[in-house]
Structures are given as structure tokens and as C-alpha cells.
């Protein structure tokens, strides 16, 4: 980090020192102070800038704490970096090396930099710069103490960016009013630190917490900027507006989301009110500006040696006026992008010309006393041959960095089609085929949760982005930080990376996602792929290492906002891994990976490099925008299952597993099975037209992962397996060893195999539709299935069916448990439906693994797994009567069972995110109802004909269900990851488990003898009791109330139902011996008449006890008389 250029001139003055102060948030400020100033005076000098009282400051240089009574010159700190810490460090700290791209944050004391001359490496940023937009209400202690930080997320309507801009402006106006009040009422009480957003009439409908701070909690640059009138700031913002929109103007009217709660765009009258209030503030500020000019004009020579009070007053004025100017400038820049298209039909509303991402710079959002680390990525513009590069936003961004309003409203897309049909204002937009492609990635490197989603916005008839599956709770030990939420249409996290690509060259390779471009030459321009891959991977990977508060939503087509409450507490590192669409795919939880391989990475970068390719959505399609929120480096592993999942804009997808990608039109929902990709697919192996070669794809992913995981000790270019990666992080050596506690049973062993052979790059490739990792794993899979699946038998069709029946039948209890609490369609046997469906799917997968030997092994296997997942979802949705909420309840119930022992808030967040993504998946389901009707089984239907061997196996399975349950059911204390590894089997049936219980109950003899409402309760008790150890003879209530020591001695006591055992125990207790031999006594006691007498006596004793026991209630035990009546 380098000081501002303006400081170089003052460095020559021998009587002054240039000191760089680095704070805990990794920001560096440059101060020019007198060489004779002592440490105490220096602390007072910088106190207002760093928002830390001088008495709490600790300055550290070369490992030593600077003493207050010594002079700075004695420590030789000129031009050096001093580290500043508080006496009690804040709860959430940013690693010191995490922010490498930040520049000097403050101007010099002698003179600020001239306006507009800010280089890329010297961007100005401070904590209050963008602390105004945030979704959810934060419940934070005011005293700075923190345990878990909870986000209270309510149902937030979709917000619009113009509304966000006005809200930001109003909050900054409030801050300016506070500063003016402090200047007008000298020595008055300090203004409030933050205003509850709910009190703002503008945001009353939305529960959007907009944290506003005064300069007290702001890192205001003590060496203030040069005086600059608000009008100048406005002019600068206006002058720079055209140059700051490399990505093109935004539409006058954003496309409304499918939900009813459309964005609430503000009217021009509201804009006028805000401008009038700004005008009033400027008039109030004028007298202080005059004094500000006078003080600064004489600052170079004024002698304050005998006028300490005057110096403090002037310094206070400089700080407050400078802060007011900064807020005023931010306000003007935030408002300067608002436009009103007069060509639209009334009522007209405001829209924005460019998103805030073009202004954003790293900062720290701080509310109450807990700083929340936020980084907003810089804007990177890529240009191609033959195109005019747009101006770089970094070099021209106004100093206030208004984009610090880290929110990009529902139209966080940079380009969107105008619904009114009027041309959007601003710079003339390029032709439809050359609209910029924008990639936004929000990443948090230490959060224990992962949220990733993507939306490629296309024409109105196109389905929205297929949601990704949230992953299990992950996070490095020691981080209990705020986690993110997804509120579609109102992303609260600042965008990490914005790569704007204007007017891409026509020679770029084609990709299946963009509009067709005449003359596109697939394969052309590949010579620059190597350097481009290096640039993209290095850029994204480096920027992803910056922590960011996550809350990014998909624009337009996002699912309805149903944010969850989430909290992350420090704890052990849980390591959840999902093997992606691996051979065990059908047994994986359906929602997590329903759309794996939906979108190839070529489409992601294709959007960046330019539109081209057959099968595009047509000329009416607008520029796709991809939004990815990615918190958590460890979570990145499991987050791979969610990465880049969006709908294909072309007809059934180009990737090898066509089934997952939802077709663009309803009539295509009955798309042919994956084996026959549509006409768009031209490359061998069933792959669709790829705009980028596999080598380029792999190099980019490898580069990103290397940069991303570098902090976790991953070697550059390493192909470390997932198992090795997790074992290295956790310090355990048996996480993925077959037979270990965390990986029992067939599916656990299969997961172990995949994790030991797949690297994270392989998983990313699989999720983008590249089957090469599966192709490479063919020998190991075949050997594994032969040993663990067939038990060494020959892979004949009969043996495969028998093994499949044995395996899937063991899942019956899980299917029954999953559907025990939902309403199934009348007459549907949900258990049989799921079991037989799984048998058929897994049978085809196993047969393919055992018999396929050609080069199409991997592509077909990936296709089968994805097809099975989508059909499983469609089938269970049909069995549940089309009730998406019921299906979500089944899946979330399974998640909760697998996540016992995990932080409940994380589980709640996970289930809510799953519901959001499931809804979008189901809305664009590529499998039609006709395709799954053949799997539906009705109550009373004859059983499906099976070979004789499976029937025998079924009998043996039913007689000994315990081993299967033991292998497939996660213990209550398992981690989410272990549960995930074992949970997949039940989850696929997860679509309709409650119905299974209901249907099964009707076939059980006891079900008819109890009220219907008791059936699910009893079934649940039965399931839970089967999983616990046998209880001692005494009642649970009696034992639970007994002292532990006595309970231990009482184990096994109680009445014996067998007379021989009762007599034998009584004889031993009394020390008596039978007159005859023990065998003779046993034979006598087993005589029928003796047994009957004993039975009658036992019944009589119990009846007497029931009659005399005052605690016995016949109403509570209505069936007791059946067991102990006179007549058996």
C-alpha cells in the first residue's frame, strides 16, 4: 500500500514525518506530522480518524509498543507502517494480510490530493463509506460484547435499486444533519450512532436495516480532503457519469419478478424532496464552509503553540466539515445515477443508469459496536480486439466511493430489457448481441455457511436460474461471524468482482447461453485463452480471498424472498462433502444437486467473452447477468454442488446430462432422455457446443481454487483429493476410511471412494457437465461395485437386480420416516413408489458401471445420475398432490435429522435456502408428469414381479432390519457432513415420505385399532425406539426419576414372563438348590398346566395392582383391560 501521491512533496520537509498507520481492518492511513510530536499527541491527532479514543490506542512498531512520553522521531517511524490496535480488540477481526489491494485511505495533513486524481492503487475507503444498505435487522449488543451474531430476517419485499439509492441518500442526509447539529451546538451531546431503519418512512414496507453512522463511528480521514463545495462534487459526479458506465445503461423499467411483490420503484417527486433537503443542508453548511476556507487558507503558517483551545476547535471544524462534504458528495453521486424516462407511459418512476458496483471499494460496515467486515470489489474492464475499451471506473470513481452502498437492488443486473419498450437513457446501448456480460462474485472467506446462486436473465418466457443447493455448516474453528442471507432482488452484499465486457469481438468461441451472433466462428481466438485464463483465475482467486458479508440475490427471476434466521458460532470444523452427480447420485438428497451440470463454465465465461453460439434464446434475450455469493473457503468444497447452477437458455442442455437443465419452453418439458442431446449439441460425446476448450476451463478453475485455498495450505497447482484436503484441515486420519464411524454401509464407502479420487477441480468440472473425472474413475468404480455391490459375484442381470433389491430395500425405514408427517395423494403407496423407482434407477446405474467399457462411460453415468435426481423430485411432487410445501417439508425434515448436533440456526438457514432453491427447480422442472406416472404405485396394486432371489433377500431383510438401519441412519451426534454422506439414500425418496407412513400404517394390523391421528405419532415412536438400545424392564419414567447409582443396580430386574426363569432367579437369590436335578426342575416348570397357572397368577397380581394403584387411569391406558382381562 502506497501513500497518496500528494504526500511525496511534503516528505522533503525535514521538520515533518510521514507516518503510515495500519488498523485492524487492514486499512492504512498516511499522516504528515511534526517530527517533534510525541506519541501521546500523535494518538490524539489520529483519534478522530480511526474512531478509537487516544487512551485506548496501542501503537506497535517492530514489535514494540510506542510509549506516550517519547517522540515519534526517536522510534524512526518516518515513512514506516505503525500498527494500531485497541486495548480490547473487537470481536470480529480481519486477518492482517487479507486486504492486499487497498490503498492509502487518507490524504496528507499538509494538503489533500487534487480532486479526481486518484490512482487505482490509492483508492479512498473508510468504514462509513458504504454502511448504509443491509438486508435484515441485526440484533447487536450496544456494549460491544458478542456471542453469536443473529440476523433477524423477515419477509422482505423485493427492493429496487432506485429506492435503495434514495434510502442511502436519506441516511447520509441524516448523518449530515447530525454533523451540522454538532457544529451548530458546540459541545452538545453526541448524535446517535445509528437510526433504526424501520423509522424511515421510505423503507417502512421493507424490513431493511440500513445502518447509518455519524462521524464518531466513522474512519474519517483526519487529514481532511481539500475543501470542495457540494456543487463541485455534483458536477464531478455528473461529468464522470458517462465514463463510469462501461457496462451500458440500465433499463427504464426492470422486468418484474414472477412473484407478486414487484420492486417498489420511487416516483420522481420523492427524488425532488431529497434534492430540496440537500439544498437546505447546503445553506446550513455555508457559514461553516466559510470558516473552513479561512482555517485551511491559514493552516500552513498559523501558530497554535499558545492557543491549544483554538487549535482543537479548528481541528474539530476541519474534521466535521470534511466529513459533511464527504457525505454530501456521496449523496450526490448516489443520486446522480437516477433518471426518469419521459418517453414511458405514466405513472413514471425512477431508474438507475449504472449499478453501484462501479464505485465500490473495500470498506468495513460497522453497526453498534461490532464491525462487520465487508469488501466491495473493484471494477475490472476487459476489452477485446477491435473494440474501444471503456474508461476504467477505478481511475475515475469519485472519491467518496458512493458505491459503498453495497446493495444492488433487484435489478443488480447491469443490463436489463426495458419493459416499456422505450430506449433507456444514457449512453447509446450497443446492439443486443453485444450487450456487456457482467459477472459478480461475492465471497466470504471465513463464514461457516455457503450460499451460491446464479441467474442468467433472458427473455420473459425463459425460466429463472436453477437454484443451487445450500450446503452443510462449515467453517474454520474460531470464527463466529455474521452469516449471510439470500433475499432475491435485494442483495445486501457488495459485489466482489465485476467484469464488464462491452461489445465483444465476433471471433470469440460460441457458447450455449447467449444470443446468436451472425458470423460467430467457434474456435476462433483461442490463442489468447492461456493468458486470459491466467488473468481471470488470478483476478478472481485473489479477490475471493477478501471477506465479504454475504447476502446476494438473483435478480428478476429469483425465488420469492423467504429469508431464514442464521447464526454462526465458533466451533469445530465440520467437513461436509458432496460427491456431486456421482454414481450414487440417485441416492443423494434430491434438492441439493438437482441441477448439477446445468450450466457449463463455458457459459459463465462465454457471457464474459461475448455472445455467440447456436441454440441461443433469440434476439429478444437481454444480456445475462450472473450473480454468485460464495461465503466460506472450507465451505467452498461443498459449495461446489451449488456453483454456477442456472437455467440453460438453449433447448435441452448441451452438457452430457441433458435432463437437469430445464428447457426454455413448456412444450419441451418432455425432453428426450439425456442420451439424445438436442440438435444444438455438436461436439462428440454428447457435449453441447462449448465456447471454451476443456484445457482453458480446467486452467481457470485450477487457478481460482489455488488462490482461494492458498490460505488453507493448498499447494499451487495441487490435485489434492477432497478426502486428503479435509483430513489435513481436520487433523483426523479416518474421516473417509471405509468402515469408519462416519462412512458405514455401501453409500458411505462409495462416498469415501469418490472423495479419495476426486479433487475439487474434478467436482467443479462435473457440476459444469464435464464427465472426464467420472471417465477417469471407471476402473475404480467397477472394482468397487463388483466387491461391495455384487459381493464378488458375476455381473449378470439377475445378480445386479438382486443386489439392487437388497440395497434399496434397506432404505425402506428411511423412506417411511421421511414421509411420516406429510399428506400423500389418496391411494398412493408412497413407500413402494419410491423403493421401486430407486431400484429401477440404481439398477440401470449399476448395470452401466459394470458393463460399459467405451469412452461414453462418464457422460452416460453423469446423465443417469442427473436424470434420476430430477425424476425423483418430479415423482414425489406428483405423489404429494403437487404440493411444493409438502415436498420441501420432507426434504427439510431429512436435513434436520441428518444435522442433529449442528447449530440449530444454521440448520434453519439451510432448510430455508433449500426451500427457495427447490421452488425454482420445480418451476422449471425438465421432467414432465407423463414421464414419471409409470413409477407411481397404488395401495393394493400387485407387487412388482421380482426374481426369486430378491424375494428371498427381502424376507431376510425384513427379519433383520437392524443392521440396515445401523448402516444408513446417522447417529444423533453425527456432524452434518457425516449425515450428508449417509443421508443421501433416504433423501431421494425424500419427496413424499409422510405419505409412505400413512399408506404403510393402513396395512399394519394395529393401525385400524387406533384413532387415525395416533397413527403417525405411534409410527414415529416406533422408528425412534428402533434406533435406541433396548430399555431395561422398568418403565422409562420410573428409571429416569431414579438416582443413577440405583438405576445401575436395578438394570434387568422385573417380573419374568417365563416361570422357569423366575424360579431359577428366585432360587439363586435365596441360595436354595432343587431337590432334583436342575434339568428335571426345568422340565416340570415347562409343563403346560404349570405355565397356565403362572400366567393366571401373574395376571391376577397385575389386575390387583391396577385396582389399588391410585395413579392408574383407565382413560390414559384405554387398552390395558385387553391384556389383563379375566378372559384372555
From Swiss-Prot:
CDD domains of this UniProt entry? Ubl_BAG6 (cd01809)
Listed GO cellular component terms? BAT3 complex; cytosol; extracellular region; nucleus
| Pro residues: bias regions | 248-257, 388-402, 422-433, 502-515, 583-594, 652-677
Residue segments, region Required for interaction with GET4: 1006-1036
List the residues marked with site Cleavage.
997-998
Q: Where is this region: 4 X 29 AA approximate repeats?
A: 236-630
**Motif Nuclear localization site: which ranges?**
1008-1050
Q: Which stretches does the entry tag as region BAG-similar domain, required and sufficient for interaction with UBL4A? A: 1054-1111
The cross-references to PANTHER family, in alphabetical order and at most eight, read:
LARGE PROLINE-RICH PROTEIN BAG6
According to the UniProt entry, which residue ranges have a biased composition of type Gly residues?
678-688
Protein name per the record = Large proline-rich protein BAG6
Keyword match Phosphoprotein: yes
GN (gene name): BAG6
